[in-house]
Swiss-Prot record:
The keyword Signal applies. Disulfide bonds join C97-C152, C115-C167, C122-C129. Gene3D superfamilies: Ribonuclease A-like domain. Belongs to the pancreatic ribonuclease family. This is Inactive ribonuclease-like protein 9. One of its GO terms (biological process) is defense response to Gram-positive bacterium. Residues 1-26 form the signal peptide. Glycans are attached at N130, N142. Keywords: Disulfide bond, Glycoprotein, Secreted, Signal. Pfam families: RnaseA. It comes from the Eukaryota. It is found in: Secreted. One of its GO terms (molecular function) is nucleic acid binding.
């Protein structure tokens, strides 16, 4: 019940809880109703992120799995894929819609391994990204309407390509973990991504 309410009416639930919790602190919320601990933890995470005025918290495996990794089910080429999945997975930044997002049909462990691949230019040409060695299926979501939830509307683009990601070091586990999905680059037909030295390059 709690998960259904969170995924279908996130803004309404957050506004209601803000009124109920003032001036009570979040840790003082009465949790004597029937709700699994993990669902309460997820709700608290949403509230903390929405109300925070500081920098965005570093990514975790759980966040990446929840927001990026998808399972076979709804056809990836469905025109409403992004609208449905972004609402279902609560992919927002504070009270605003994200301008773009990627969903990837792969396992988290496979995505994490990309962090140890060689560097390539990101799509903006400024930063360095890590590229997958093989092609990955996914969906690119581009915001077309609204800036604040729940009015986010997206156009969906099915892609099969090389994943470009940035990674961050996590001290707790002493490993690199995926930070952001930078792009899903579709290879041009009959054209190699390797130059004469065997180094991967992004075509202009």
């Amino acid at each position: 019940m709690m998960r259904t309410l969170i995924t279908t009416h996130p803004l309404l639930l957050l506004l209601l809880l803000q009124q109920l919790l003032q001036p009570v602190q979040l840790q003082e919320v009465d949790t004597d109703f029937d709700s699994p601990d993990d669902e309460m933890e997820e709700l608290e995470e949403y509230l903390e992120e929405f109300q925070s005025t500081g920098p965005t918290r570093p990514p975790t495996k759980e966040n990446v799995e929840r927001r990026v990794i998808i399972e076979p089910g709804m056809p990836l080429y469905d025109r409403d894929y992004c609208n449905e999945e972004i609402k279902r997975k609560n992919v927002y930044h504070k009270y605003r819609c994200v301008t773009e997002h990627y969903f990837l049909l792969m396992q988290y462990d496979e995505l994490q391994k990309i962090c140890y691949n060689r560097f390539v230019p990101c799509k903006n040409g400024v930063r360095k990204c890590n590229r997958s060695k093989g092609l990955v299926e996914g969906v690119y979501c581009n915001l077309t309407e609204a800036l604040e939830i729940p009015g986010c509307e997206y156009k969906s683009f099915y892609r099969t390509g090389y994943v470009l990601i940035t990674c961050a070091w996590q001290n707790e586990i002493h490993k690199l973990i995926p930070h952001t999905i930078n792009d899903l680059v579709e290879p041009p037909k009959h054209r190699s991504f390797l130059n004469e030295d065997g180094v991967f390059v992004i075509p202009p």
